[in-house]
């Protein structure tokens, strides 16, 4: 069907007959880069993150999904907040979880968790003497490990596409049960495409009233061009008064698409 160049207002348009999972998050999630799943674990929004976790786990039935890229079509769509909270709820299950801030252009994980960014992914890739154990930080009061971006480099795409990155990812796969890579938007730079081709699955974050339909479709095409395994879509920024369900999710399986 023809897609108009308008902002996303509801889930019905989602990719015509090619829609996959849609997981709704209400508008509380954009009240700053806060770790809502820890600050308010009994809130509706925290439960929504647990719902997303459950849906990802269902996708693991037929194949192992250990490494996940989180991305979006553009900025301000909530991918970094979603990444942090999703990593947090996975760690609540006793799993060994690592959040990697692989947005080497506008990193946020160090701000979200209030930790140092003097060293991180970029220094781990560029300094042979630096080790994973020296660089990863465990968040106080949780079982969650975070690998911040490190200093912003002049060559993000080259670092992510390097042999050293491939070797690092293999090491992390051996150390952790779940690894979430927070990436830049798909349509702005090639970083997300590079990483999407390396991981087990991709979660795409779409923001109600912000994301442009044509941009989302273009981003989906770019991911499919590198044979990315798109696990599903998170639709966030839903207001109570918009007429949508305040919590919950919609689901369309691959077989129904």
Give residue ranges: language-model regions.
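Walker A/P-loop phosphate-binding motif and the immediately C-terminal alpha-helix
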Residues: 44-113
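Hydrophobic micro-sites
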Residues: 4-33, 217-257
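Phosphate-binding loop that captures ATP/GTP phosphates
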Residues: 90-148, 212
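Conserved nucleotide-binding/hydrolysis micro-motifs of P-loop NTPases
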Residues: 104-106, 130, 151-154, 186-187, ...
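Inter-motif core of Ras-like GTPase G domains
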Residues: 191-209
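Extended, non-globular alpha-helical segments
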Residues: 33-61, 131-133, 148
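Phosphate-binding/switch loop-helix module in NTP-utilizing enzymes
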Residues: 131, 149-189
């Amino acid at each position: 069907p023809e897609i108009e160049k308008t902002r996303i207002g509801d889930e019905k348009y989602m990719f015509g007959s090619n829609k996959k999972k849609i997981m709704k998050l209400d508008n509380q999630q954009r009240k700053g880069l806060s770790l809502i799943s820890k600050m308010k674990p009994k809130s509706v929004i925290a439960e929504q993150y647990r719902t997303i976790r459950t849906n990802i786990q269902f996708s693991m039935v037929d194949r192992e999904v250990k490494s996940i890229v989180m991305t979006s079509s553009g900025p301000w769509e909530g991918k970094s907040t979603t990444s942090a909270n999703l990593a947090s709820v996975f760690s609540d299950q006793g799993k060994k979880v690592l959040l990697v801030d692989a947005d080497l252009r506008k990193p946020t994980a160090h701000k979200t968790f209030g930790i140092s960014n003097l060293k991180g992914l970029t220094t781990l890739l560029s300094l042979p003497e630096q080790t994973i154990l020296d660089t990863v930080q465990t968040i106080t009061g949780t079982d969650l490990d975070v690998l911040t971006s490190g200093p912003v480099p002049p060559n993000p795409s080259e670092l992510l596409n390097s042999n050293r990155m491939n070797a690092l990812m293999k090491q992390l796969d051996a150390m952790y049960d779940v690894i979430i890579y927070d990436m830049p938007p798909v349509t702005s730079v090639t970083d997300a495409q590079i990483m999407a081709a390396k991981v087990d699955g991709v979660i795409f974050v779409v923001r109600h009233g912000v994301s442009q339909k044509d941009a989302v479709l273009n981003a989906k095409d770019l991911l499919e061009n590198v044979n990315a395994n798109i696990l599903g879509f998170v639709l966030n920024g839903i207001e109570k008064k918009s007429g949508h369900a305040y919590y919950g999710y919609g689901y369309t399986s691959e077989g129904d698409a």
